[in-house]
């Protein structure tokens, strides 16, 4: 588990990691031995048709967050055939499976998300969604099938494994239904990383770059995602006599403009942050001064420092404007997912695996973005390693983005993702096999 405030540490440029890696290639690296590597390749070739069929079945039968009943049943039934120690119903519908290696060592974990999105699929695929208005438009069907394939391969290598692997199939990454807990936070709360304690956790996510490429960086890679609601409480009056009221619409407009100064004037421009207003609701008729206006929006940041700094600045602006004009207000701020933080030491240790498998020209530098991902809760509990897997057909000039009704990942990414995860997990265990659980240097 990382210690200290990560906002005080600067993201390590990937170029420096790769430069250090290339400088070290002349010396022996702990890596999967050739015999095991060939075994992985052979098993992937043998099972890839089955894994793709699993992916297509999941794609045809998408389920929303905390409702992944059939997906979890399929995952559990497949894991049962592998002889793993399985916990069902973790965080509602999650599945956690433990593979105990034949040799002593620490425990590493790997996670895939299982939920779909409320989107009507428009791909026209022969295996398109059978559930109206629900689609796997973010690649979670791909992630789940890759992780099942990884469990299949590593189970066949049990005698070679130094330590343990925890496979985490997570519900509700896109968010739990209103009023329900869910996702990674609930999995952590219910002990998905315990018994035995996990020393490092890995995950991948589909991204519309070419198959054969991955995107990666140490440090912050995605932003936190918070929401806010501001209610301006004015006083109604006739539209022809505005001086007798307090116009909540005018004050709301002033607040929208003033909030933009939080990012442009109060935040370090080298530390990304966004304050966006998504909805404004107020007023009832054209000739009535609005008494109440509600604004809703999102705040996205990378660093913990900005996440702590911005909310009180926002409220001070709202309070000042409202008090100046004799209005009241209510400011509600709802923290969401934290930023995903790739542990720098773990990143430096494991980056060579990506380069050795793919070649340094295929390991692209990920530029941190203010999208959000609840893998961050796992990475707060134990060092995390998160990367993006290219799923675009290289023959096509462009591909539909995530969350598009046309999103259609190239299935050739599935065996490659399986191979990458197998090597990452085995390399991590090999490099930590002499370190007792709970005393990992990561």
Model-flagged regions — what are they?
Residues 13-27:
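Bacterial N-terminal signal peptides
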Residues 111-126, 221-231, 391-397:
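Acidic-glycine-rich active-site phosphate/pyrophosphate-binding loop
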Residues 1-17:
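Bacterial N-terminal signal peptides that target proteins for export
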């Amino acid at each position: 588990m990382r210690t200290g405030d990560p906002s005080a540490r600067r993201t390590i440029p990937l170029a420096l990691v790769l430069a250090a890696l290339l400088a070290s290639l002349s010396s022996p690296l702990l890596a999967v031995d050739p015999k095991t590597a060939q075994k992985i390749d052979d098993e992937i070739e043998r099972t890839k048709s089955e894994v793709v069929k699993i992916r297509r079945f999941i794609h045809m039968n998408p389920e929303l967050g905390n409702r992944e009943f059939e997906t979890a049943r399929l995952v559990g039934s497949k894991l049962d055939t592998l002889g793993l120690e399985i916990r069902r119903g973790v965080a509602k519908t999650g599945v956690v499976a433990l593979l105990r290696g034949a040799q002593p060592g620490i425990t590493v974990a790997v996670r895939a998300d299982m939920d779909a999105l409320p989107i009507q699929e428009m791909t026209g695929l022969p295996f398109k969604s059978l559930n109206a208005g629900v689609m796997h438009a973010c690649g979670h069907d791909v992630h789940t099938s890759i992780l099942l394939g990884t469990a299949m391969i590593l189970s066949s290598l049990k005698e070679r494994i130094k330590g343990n692997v925890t496979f985490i199939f997570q519900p509700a990454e896109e968010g739990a239904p209103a009023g329900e807990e869910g996702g990674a936070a609930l999995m952590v709360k219910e002990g998905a990383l315990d018994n035995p304690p996990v020393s490092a956790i890995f995950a991948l996510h589909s991204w519309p770059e070419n198959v054969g490429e991955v995107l990666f960086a140490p440090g912050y890679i995605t932003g936190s995602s918070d929401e806010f609601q501001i209610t301006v409480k004015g006083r109604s009056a006739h539209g022809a006599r505005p001086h007798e009221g307090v116009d909540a619409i005018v004050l709301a407009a002033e607040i929208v403009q003033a909030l933009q100064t939080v990012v442009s004037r109060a935040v370090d421009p080298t530390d990304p942050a966004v304050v966006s207003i998504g909805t404004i609701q107020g007023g009832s008729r054209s000739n009535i001064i609005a008494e109440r206006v509600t604004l809703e929006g999102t705040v996205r940041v990378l660093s913990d420092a900005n996440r702590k700094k911005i909310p009180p600045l926002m409220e001070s602006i709202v309070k000042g404007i409202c008090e100046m004009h004799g209005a009241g207000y209510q400011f509600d701020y709802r923290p969401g997912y934290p930023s995903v933080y790739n542990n720098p030491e773990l990143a430096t240790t494991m980056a060579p695996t990506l380069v050795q498998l793919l070649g340094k020209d295929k390991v692209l530098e990920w530029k941190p973005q203010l999208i959000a991902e609840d893998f961050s809760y796992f990475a707060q509990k134990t060092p995390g390693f998160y990367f993006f897997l290219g799923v675009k057909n290289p023959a096509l000039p462009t591909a539909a983005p995530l969350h598009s009704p046309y999103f259609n990942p190239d299935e050739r990414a599935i065996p490659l993702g399986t191979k990458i995860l197998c090597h990452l997990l085995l390399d991590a265990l090999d490099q930590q096999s002499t370190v007792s659980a709970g005393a990992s240097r990561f």
